């Protein structure tokens, strides 16, 4: 319960205001977390409305199962399964999809989950600790090339190659030192390599982000769920996405722009603009947390919310 109380939902009112356009509609919260957005959506829904939420984290599922509301249901799976999960429930179209991306405060603040370099814990980083390969397991087998690509591409870390070499060198010492399986040692290795310091940022920040994204397939799942949301939204339905770093936001921005623009046509072809299919989306807005919200919750500082609306049937 303590972790739930510590978690502050970012852009709560702004997200729900943008999402709920029909109180009797069917809505999807792709990232239940500790339920802040879901509870606020339920408060806006009419008796005939419905909310289906998703989360991979077993602790989030435990929290969701305590919500006693016939209009609400929870799916223990990645939001990448949204299309199939809704079809299995007889849902063909929805009035809105909300995605609050990234890792939640309770996950970061619990050393046992292995997301944070601020407190020592097992090197796990899985959103669902019961499924898939942990960070420690991946680090125990990844090549220098794979490590470099992940840390460079997902962490935007310019010392990626040097970090990768240091990790493989540490692995060669496993017989003597034991496996690399704690967040504290990973942070220490990265700190020895990254000599420059970004103001207010630990040198391990980018590497931890990169490994977490890789272990959880976050960017691949994001692309899948954006495509699913586009096909599921009814006319007038809203897609609301909150992201916390440039990689996520870039994917969301490009997706919305691509589907809010008319297809490019060779001007030499005898095709009139009115004969082209209308783009399915209209971009509504981009919003940021207020100064007051950032002051109350510093983790909101990097949040960006993008909203688009389905304008075609």
From Swiss-Prot:
Alphabetized, the UniProt keywords read:
Cytoplasm, Methyltransferase, rRNA processing, S-adenosyl-L-methionine, Transferase
Against Pfam families, the record matches this protein to: Methyltransf_5 (PF01795)
Q: Which GO terms describe its biological process?
A: rRNA base methylation
Location of this chain's protein in the cell: Cytoplasm
Which Gene3D superfamilies does the entry link to?
Answer: Putative methyltransferase TM0872, insert domain, Vaccinia Virus protein VP39
Kindly list the cysteine pairs connected by disulfide bridges: none
Main location group: cytoplasm
Residues annotated as binding S-adenosyl-L-methionine: 35-37, 55, 79, 100, 107
- Listed GO molecular functions? rRNA (cytosine-N4-)-methyltransferase activity
What is this protein called in UniProt?
Ribosomal RNA small subunit methyltransferase H
The species is Burkholderia vietnamiensis (strain G4 / LMG 22486)
The taxonomic lineage of its organism, from the top, reads:
Bacteria, Pseudomonadati, Pseudomonadota, Betaproteobacteria, Burkholderiales
